[in-house]
Each structure stands twice: as structure tokens, then as C-alpha cells.
Amino acid sequence: MIDPKLLRTDPDAVRRSQAARGEDSSVVDDVVAADEARREAIAAHENLRAEQKGLGKRIAKASGDEKAELLSRTKTISGEVADLKKAADEADAKFTELAKTLGNIVIDGVPAGGEDEGVIKETVGTPRDFAAEGFEPKDHLEIGEALGAIDMERGTKISGSRFYVLTGVGAQLEFALLNLAMSKAAQWGFTPMIPPALVKPSAMEGTGFLGQAADDVYYLPKDDQYLVGTSEVALAAFHSDEILDDAELPKRYVAFSPCYRREAGSYGKDTRGIFRVHWFDKVEMFVYCLPQEAEAWHEKLLSFEKDFITALQIPFQVLDVASGDLGLSAARKFDCYGWLPTQNRYREITSTSNCTTFQARRLSIRHRGPDGVEPLATLNGTLCAMTRIIIMLLENHQQADGSVRIPEALRPYLGGREFIEPVK
């Protein structure tokens, strides 16, 4: 949720942000009106409550007719106070619900536009020239099946479309990537976590995933719980309703978890292989920090992602995501796109978002510093989305004989193997 003070002091900034997101900016007027009504209702209740307290003191000193009159007023005012309290609570709830529809305030400098208007910040590495090497690259599924690493047929048999099984060396690759990612994250000062994949509605709503992204999450109605699409949800809720001391910050967590996505609206897209699936495992970084340090931490998270991708020798680009494609919670987002040889284009493999104080306000996560208790900032970043990184490894490091070369950084976690050989 955005800072209510900003709605009062600079509603035009909120309108500009909504417009930049491609959203209806007129809703800001509704939120401002609801805020005014809320404050008026709260003031009315507090004023009458103060009068009620004052009556108690006067009754203690009064006698005779005056005391009887005051007692009569006390009975009357009790009902009025209760009514005003109810009205204040209802006005506050209405404001909160409306305010939660507003996206985070877009940071100055974010490219304007929609999904296709992101700006490339940099390009790292050079795609291989397979033609010069004398062979046509195979796609990840053909390679994976030959290596005995991916079984789509049985994954579909077990669970339906967009499911898979990593077998043999495919499973070993995931374990190796997990160990490499966790090793690097530990060097960067992150605390490893294995959080729940099932969360309460408050956690999902607090992170902003029940707004625009609601159709993409799995819900278990009998349990009133959600399957997470990213461990960002559990990591953000980890400190919900807490006050952290400034001396504790920044807090850095890195989690390994399964991720579940309905992929609503993706019918017909990336139907072959494991690029777009309903379940995958992911290593996710999460940071709690002081608001004034959030932009610097965003750049650090991006640098960690770049370090990991570079270690795997995958050519990639960094995209500064456009304002209309940020999602509800992010004020700025950087995506890394890895080179996919058989598609002759870059595809998304990581994402890091600066959510400023947006999620912290919704989850009541604050810090205690010299200026009192205030919301802190939260940031998240993908370190390794397993299926997509495995795709990138298979396609970018395939050899003419059907084998796959293992990047040097990954070899210690695969028993020192330099190549993976086909089994069929």
C-alpha cells in the first residue's frame, strides 16, 4: 500500500504513477475522498469519546440533579460512541480496500510504456555461432530426452499438461544449481531458508498477489490457503506484524521452494518442454532494508543475479522493465533475459524488484530508528529458476556429438564432470 500522506500532500504524483502503469488514474479521487471520510469519522468518534471520558470525571464531583443529568447523558452517549466507532471502522475499511487497488509509486526514470517498451541496460556475453561450428542446435527438450534428464510424457501422465519429471542427470543438475546458488548467496551474506509453500490469504494479499495476479495463483478453498508462485510471499510475511531495530538491518534471506503457477492467459504459449510450467523450483533472494537504501540494494541484487548467470556462461541481457509491466508491488524491476539458441532470442530467466515500503505497509513490517517507528523497504530477486536455467545450460552448452559441456563453476557440484553424455 502506498503512503496515505502522499495521497493528501501530492495526489497528482499518485495519478501520474497510475497513468504510467496504464491504470485508471481517476480511482485516486475515490481513494482521496475515502481518506477524507475516514479521517472525519475517526475524528467524530474520538471527540465524542473524549466527551464521554470527561463526563466520568464530572459525575464523580457532581451531586443531585446535575449528577442525574450527567448520568442520563452518559447512557445516551454510550450508544452514540458505539455507533461512531462502527462508522469509523467501516470508513477505515473502505479506505484500506480502495487504497490497496493502487499500485506502488513508480520510481522516476523507469521507462514508460507496456510489456514491449522495456529498455536494455546492458548485454553480457556473445551467443555461439552454431553455423560456424558446423551443426544445427537442438532444443532443450530434445537434448534433455537424449540425456535421460527430462520426461514430459510421464509428467503429463502423472499431473496433466505443463508438468514434467526431472530424471537422472536432470535431477542432478537441479541439485548442483541449488548448491552453487546457496554457496554464492552465503558468501553475499544471505541466511538460507526453506519456507512453507502454502500460505494464508493475508500473506498472499499482503505481497500484492491477489490483485492483478489473482488468476495465476492456486487456491485451496477447504483450507483457505494458497500455493505460492514464489517464495517471495513467505519471505515477506516472515516478519509481518513485527518491528525490527535499525541495527538488525539489512536482513538478507535466500530461500529454496517449489513455485506453483496456473499460467492463466498463457494458453498456446511455450507449450513444448519445461519453459512455461505449472510447477518449478526456485532459489529466491529477499532483502529488508531502510527505505533510503532500497535503490542501492536493488542494484546489488541485480549484480548477484548477473554474477550467477555469468558463472554459468550464459549470454544475457538486462532489461529495465517498463512502467506498465511492473506488477502491483514493484516500483522498479530489472529482468535478466538469457539467450535461447533455438528461438534465436533472449528469454526471461530472472527478475528483481524494488517494492519500496509498499509490501511492508500491507504486512505491517516496521523499523525502529531515531525518528521513531516507520515502514521499512522490501526487495526480491530470482537467483535461480531451475527449469529455465536448465534450459539455458542444455541449449547454450550443447555439443555436436549430443553431449552438454558443464560450466566450470558447476563442476564441483557434479562430481567434477566436464560433460554430460547422451544415454540414448
Curated annotation (Swiss-Prot):
Keywords: Aminoacyl-tRNA synthetase, ATP-binding, Cytoplasm, Ligase, Nucleotide-binding, Protein biosynthesis. L-serine binds at T230, S231, E232, E284, T382. Disulfide bonds: none annotated. Its EC number is 6.1.1.11. It is found in: Cytoplasm. Residues 1-27 are annotated as: Disordered. It catalyses: tRNA(Ser) + L-serine + ATP = L-seryl-tRNA(Ser) + AMP + diphosphate + H(+); tRNA(Sec) + L-serine + ATP = L-seryl-tRNA(Sec) + AMP + diphosphate + H(+). Residues 1-15 have a biased composition (Basic and acidic residues). Its main location: cytoplasm. InterPro entries: aa-tRNA-synt_IIb, aa-tRNA-synth_II, aa-tRNA-synth_II/BPL/LPL, Ser-tRNA-ligase_type_1, Ser-tRNA-synth_1_N, SerRS_1_N_sf, SerRS_core, tRNA-bd_arm. SUPFAM superfamilies: Class II aaRS and biotin synthetases, tRNA-binding arm. HAMAP family: Ser_tRNA_synth_type1. Belongs to the class-II aminoacyl-tRNA synthetase family. Type-1 seryl-tRNA synthetase subfamily. This is Serine--tRNA ligase. The gene is serS.
